[in-house]
């Protein structure tokens, strides 16, 4: 089973799309709202050249920034 963490914001449509996509696939994940967690926001900036790209998704240690559904599916499948 893939370990998935989604770093995003509640108001962000791309974040919400990714959450719905994973729900449809039945993939469990941890969602971290970077607007309420400065340490997580810092982690996102470190992995995105100083930008808070939402969503930034970590799948089994691999970091994806604003991935397409296909990119996310491929990362989950390994």
Per-region residue spans from a language model:
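Short, charge-rich, low-complexity interaction segments located
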Residues: 42-46
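Local sequence-structure signature of Cys/Sec-based thiol-disulfide redox active-site neighborhoods
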Residues: 1-25
């Amino acid at each position: 089973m893939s370990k998935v963490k989604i770093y995003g914001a509640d108001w962000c449509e791309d974040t919400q799309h990714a959450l719905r996509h994973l729900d449809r696939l039945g993939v469990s994940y941890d969602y971290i709202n970077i607007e309420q967690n400065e340490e997580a926001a810092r982690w996102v900036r470190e992995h995105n050249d100083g930008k808070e790209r939402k969503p930034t998704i970590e799948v089994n240690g691999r970091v994806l920034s604003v991935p397409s559904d296909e990119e996310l599916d491929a990362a989950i499948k390994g």
